[in-house]
């Protein structure tokens, strides 16, 4: 934890950030293996759930409550996934992974944003991916864009897929503990329509790893 985040101030924070770190680690692994389709044909993480109340690496606890990893897995196991390969010298390569039987296309925009969410730079491209395959898009070199302000900016990639789904990736140039992240003020609205309850969050600055709890 201390390699990536400021050390938690209390036990509750320690529990939370440990789950976040687990989710990031497994997400990174699964997306890497999916990008290497042909060499690696699948990835299953251990473990899904617990059969007794215990502190464990399960993504769903004994009571059926989702941990961070379970929420992350809905995205990194999506049939159509956009991910980012980060190489040395700040080269970011978007990848499109297609696990369906139909051809898909995707429009991706790579942004460099500051910690207020303002766009400092962007690049857009489009790719088509055959069924059951992976497509590497054009690499994007951001060295000249982020050099000297690695603690002040982050990279975001937004993929809009032809099947109507969306992938979003965020990468920090440095570990989170070195990033000058602003304290965000988050507000929310709750809307009820019949049996459907919708919670909408609004933040005045980028807010990472936000969770919602309700009684």
What would you call each of these model-derived segments?
Residues 74-110, 177-203:
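Surface beta-strand/loop "capping" patches
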Residues 43, 94, 157, 201, ...:
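Hydrophobic, well-ordered secondary-structure elements that form the walls
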Residues 181, 206-215:
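Intrinsically disordered, low-complexity Ser/Thr/Gly-rich stretches
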Residues 1-104:
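Substrate-binding clefts and catalytic carboxylate motifs of secreted carbohydrate-active enzymes
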Residues 39, 102-106, 121, 149-151, ...:
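Short loop/turn segments at connectors of secondary-structure elements within structured domains
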Residues 107-149, 215:
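Intrinsically disordered, low-complexity Pro/Gly/Ser/Thr-rich segments with frequent PxxP/GP/PP motifs
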């Amino acid at each position: 934890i201390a390699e990536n985040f400021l050390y938690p101030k209390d036990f509750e924070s320690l529990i939370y950030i440990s789950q976040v770190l687990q989710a990031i680690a497994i997400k990174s692994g699964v997306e890497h293996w999916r990008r290497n389709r042909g060499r690696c044909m699948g990835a299953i993480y251990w473990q899904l759930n617990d059969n007794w109340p215990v502190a464990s690496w399960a993504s769903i606890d004994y009571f059926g409550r989702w941990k961070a990893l379970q929420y992350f897995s809905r995205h990194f196991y999506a049939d159509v996934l956009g991910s980012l390969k980060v190489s040395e010298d700040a080269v970011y390569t978007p990848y499109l992974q297609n696990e369906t039987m139909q051809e898909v296309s995707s429009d991706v925009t790579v942004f460099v944003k500051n910690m207020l969410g303002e766009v400092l730079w962007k690049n857009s491209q489009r790719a088509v991916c055959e069924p059951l395959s992976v497509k590497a898009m054009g690499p994007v070199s951001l060295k000249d864009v982020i050099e000297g302000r690695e603690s002040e900016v982050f990279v975001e990639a937004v993929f809009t897929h032809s099947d109507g789904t969306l992938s979003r990736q965020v990468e920090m140039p440095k570990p989170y503990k070195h990033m000058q992240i602003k304290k965000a003020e988050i507000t929310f609205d709750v809307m009820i329509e019949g049996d459907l309850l919708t919670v909408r969050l609004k933040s005045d600055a980028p807010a990472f790893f936000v969770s919602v709890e309700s009684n």
